[in-house]
């Protein structure tokens, strides 16, 4: 049996399909491997980032904060439980205490009720006893009032009492008059003593105030003298400041003159170089140097004169400055003599020698001028510094003087204000003491007048009572004499009193 023959294109198609399938499988495996690798790296990145985050300081702080929060919550919870337990115990203790108080109150109410009942019984019995005593007393008073013998005895006793009381009233009146007189004398003596003490106090206060016024006046005079001295000192300081400013301006003017002379010398020197006239130039240059030296000498002489006029420099610095200026003056005079000798010598030189001598002397002159300018600059700078220091010292002294004067003026104003207040207080005190004394005198007079009025009223009342008693007694005696004895009817049997 023969097998069917497969065409060739079918085999190639099958191989192509197999190759495509293998390629797809490989791509699927690669894609799967890529996804696994990417997932692995992604997970690794996530793990590393989480580990880095967890191991970082921020994560540590966050963890510690969370731990602290949990710990604080736990502590708050325990504290809350403890407070609740304590509150529960307090409420239980309070309930127990209230129960005990209620029990004690119930017992005390029973005891109080028993005591009230006992007190009620005692009060009732005491009231019955008191009622009996009052009834007996009333019966006794009724019998005493209606008994004629007792009434006669009472009338006799009353007459004797009136007579005796009249004598006693006379004695009491005399004693009261004597006592009132003694009181008046005592009041007068006390008033006189108080008046003398007040006068002595006022006199002592016046003497003390006069002494204080005298001391204050002396202090004011002293402060005013000091203020005048300070004003004179301020005027002196202002004048001194003006002089210092003038000296500084003079120094500036001298320095400006030196600068102008230097500029003029430079211009003249330039002209001489252009004309090449060495002999004439040497003569003129020598004359110019002499003029410069003369000018420097005049400046130093002026500085010496200013230093002699100065009164506020320290001694050591002043001597140093004087020595420097004197040395500079001596050096300039020596230089001036040397220049004069050179001028005489230059008259004998030839043209070529004069040229060489010109160059040589010009170098020497330049060195000497530089040294001289430096020394003059130092001297002028020192003088300017001294003047500036004087100006500063003068300014500070003026400020101190102004402050002191202002303080003195304030002190004077305070002293005047204090004196005014003390005077007002003294006047008020005098007025108050005067009013107090007048009030005491008026009060004592009023007391004496009230005592006299009361005594007169008492005497008048005593006389009126006595007259009324005598009239009633006489009227009662006449009535009894006219009517005779009449027994009184009694509505109840008499009680035999022992």
Swiss-Prot record:
Ranges annotated as biased composition (Basic and acidic residues): 168-189
Tissues with expression: Expressed at high levels in normal urothelial and breast epithelial cells. Also expressed in the smooth muscle and endothelial cells. Reduced expression seen in advanced bladder and breast carcinomas (at protein level). Ubiquitous. Expressed at highest levels in the heart, skeletal muscle, kidney, liver and testis.
Residue numbers spanned by region Trichohyalin/plectin homology domain: 259-425
InterPro entries: CFAP53/TCHP (IPR043596), TPH_dom (IPR043597)
Post-translational modification: Ubiquitinated. Ubiquitination by the BCR(KCTD17) E3 ubiquitin ligase complex results in proteasomal degradation, and induces ciliogenesis.
Subunit structure: Interacts specifically with keratin proteins including, KRT5, KRT6A, KRT8, KRT14, KRT16 and KRT18. Interacts with KCTD17.
Protein name: Trichoplein keratin filament-binding protein
Organism: Homo sapiens
């Amino acid at each position: 049996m023969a097998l069917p023959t497969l065409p060739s294109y079918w085999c190639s198609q099958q191989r192509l399909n197999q190759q495509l399938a293998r390629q797809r499988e490989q791509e699927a495996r690669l894609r799967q491997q890529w996804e696994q690798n990417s997932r692995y790296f992604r997970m690794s990145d996530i793990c590393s980032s989480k580990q880095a985050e967890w191991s970082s300081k921020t994560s540590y702080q966050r963890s510690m904060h969370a731990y602290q929060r949990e710990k604080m919550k736990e502590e708050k919870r325990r504290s809350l439980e403890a407070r609740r337990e304590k509150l529960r115990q307090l409420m239980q203790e309070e309930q127990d205490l209230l129960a005990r108080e209620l029990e004690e109150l119930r017992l005390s109410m029973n005891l109080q009720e028993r005591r009230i009942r006992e007190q009620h019984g005692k009060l009732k019995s005491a009231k019955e006893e008191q009622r009996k005593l009052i009834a007996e007393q009333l019966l006794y008073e009724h019998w005493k009032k209606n008994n004629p013998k007792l009434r006669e005895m009472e009338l006799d006793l009353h007459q004797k009492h009136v007579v005796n009381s009249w004598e006693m009233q006379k004695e009491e009146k005399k004693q009261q008059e004597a006592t009132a007189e003694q009181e008046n004398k005592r009041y007068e003596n006390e008033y006189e003593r108080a008046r003398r003490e007040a006068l002595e106090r006022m006199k002592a206060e016046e003497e003390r105030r006069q002494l204080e016024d005298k001391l204050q006046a002396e202090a004011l005079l002293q402060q005013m003298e000091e203020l005048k001295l300070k004003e004179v000192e301020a005027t002196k300081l202002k004048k001194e400041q003006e002089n210092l400013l003038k000296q500084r301006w003079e120094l500036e003017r001298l320095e400006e003159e030196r600068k102008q002379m230097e500029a003029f010398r430079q211009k003249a020197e330039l002209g001489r170089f252009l004309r090449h006239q060495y002999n004439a130039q040497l003569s003129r240059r020598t004359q110019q140097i002499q003029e410069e030296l003369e000018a420097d000498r005049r400046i130093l002489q002026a500085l010496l004169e200013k230093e002699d006029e100065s009164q506020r420099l320290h001694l050591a610095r002043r001597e140093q400055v004087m020595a420097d200026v004197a040395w500079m003056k001596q050096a300039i005079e020596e230089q001036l003599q040397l220049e004069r000798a050179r001028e005489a010598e230059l008259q004998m030189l030839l043209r070529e020698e004069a040229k060489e001598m010109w160059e040589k002397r010009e170098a020497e002159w330049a060195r000497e001028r530089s040294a001289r300018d430096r020394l003059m600059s130092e001297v002028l700078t020192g003088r300017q510094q001294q003047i500036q220091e004087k100006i500063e010292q003068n300014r500070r002294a003026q400020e101190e003087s102004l402050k002191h004067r202002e303080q003195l003026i304030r002190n004077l104003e305070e002293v005047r204000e204090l004196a005014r207040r003390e005077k007002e207080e003294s006047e008020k005190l005098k007025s108050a003491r005067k009013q107090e004394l007048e009030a005491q005198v008026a009060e004592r007079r009023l007391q004496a007048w009230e005592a006299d009025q009361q005594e007169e009223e008492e005497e008048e009342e005593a006389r009126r009572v006595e007259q009324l008693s005598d009239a009633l007694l006489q009227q009662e005696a006449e009535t009894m004499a006219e009517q005779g004895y009449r027994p009184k009817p009694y509505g109840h049997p008499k009680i035999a009193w022992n």
